[in-house]
Amino acid sequence: MMFPSRPMLCVITDEELPPVTFARQALWGGATILQLRNKTASGRDLCRWSEAILPLTRQHNALFIVNDRLDIALATGADGVHLGQDDLPATVARKLLGPDRIIGVSTGTREEALQAEKEGADYVGFGHIFPTGSKDKPLPPVGTLALQDTASLLSIPLIAIGGIQLENARRVISCGASGIAVISAVSRHPDPRIAAEALVREMEEGMLL
């Protein structure tokens, strides 16, 4: 699977916002990956949203990833699925998805990231890098040193996640991340499109450091 050579902006849908409208704004702002994530929505709603978001990503030459729900990804023709540590192993997901779709895996340690690559993940999400309020009772942040160390050992893209905002996006890229994954940095901005555009600019600056 080929990923963009420029830093990737993965925007994850916010459960408090209409996902299709939010996805459209993020894509106009330059998101290269749109991930549909909603832990409480019904399968029917996830299918409906996926079928609406997928053509939007095609219009913007972006990738569409479904969080956790392998069945939804398969049913709607999504580009891939993002799995957590408690979900199906990447090896099993690959048997179901086939060789051409993307599998991402959430990781929080160097060992988890290396294991995900060994099991056939196409990219890893790594973090959380900074303190974040998006998860209940989160573990301490792993920090940029662990990010730099882990990224140097992987041959697949590492997308940093957790507490990433405009003011630290450049530093994350300069530490070796292939991209960032965000929710609130885009969803809490009055204009998600402008927020996404600003993050893209900061990441491009980070490549020059």
From Swiss-Prot:
Q: Which residues bind Mg(2+)?
A: 68, 87
Which GO CC terms are listed, alphabetically?
Answer: cytoplasm
Per the entry, which co-factors are needed? Mg(2+)
Give the enzyme's main class according to its UniProt record, as a single word. Answer: transferase
Classification via InterPro entries: Aldolase_TIM, ThiamineP_synth_sf, ThiamineP_synth_TenI, TMP_synthase
Q: Tell me which domain of life the UniProt entry assigns to the organism this sequence originates from.
A: Bacteria
Q: Name one GO molecular function term.
A: thiamine-phosphate diphosphorylase activity
Q: Tell me which UniProt keywords the record has, alphabetically.
A: Magnesium, Metal-binding, Thiamine biosynthesis, Transferase
Q: What does the record give as its pathway? A: Cofactor biosynthesis; thiamine diphosphate biosynthesis; thiamine phosphate from 4-amino-2-methyl-5-diphosphomethylpyrimidine and 4-methyl-5-(2-phosphoethyl)-thiazole: step 1/1
Q: Would you kindly state one Gene Ontology biological process term found in this protein's UniProt entry?
A: thiamine diphosphate biosynthetic process
User: How are cofactors bound according to the entry's free-text note?
Assistant: Binds 1 Mg(2+) ion per subunit.
* Family the entry assigns: Belongs to the thiamine-phosphate synthase family.
Protein's name according to its UniProt entry: Thiamine-phosphate synthase
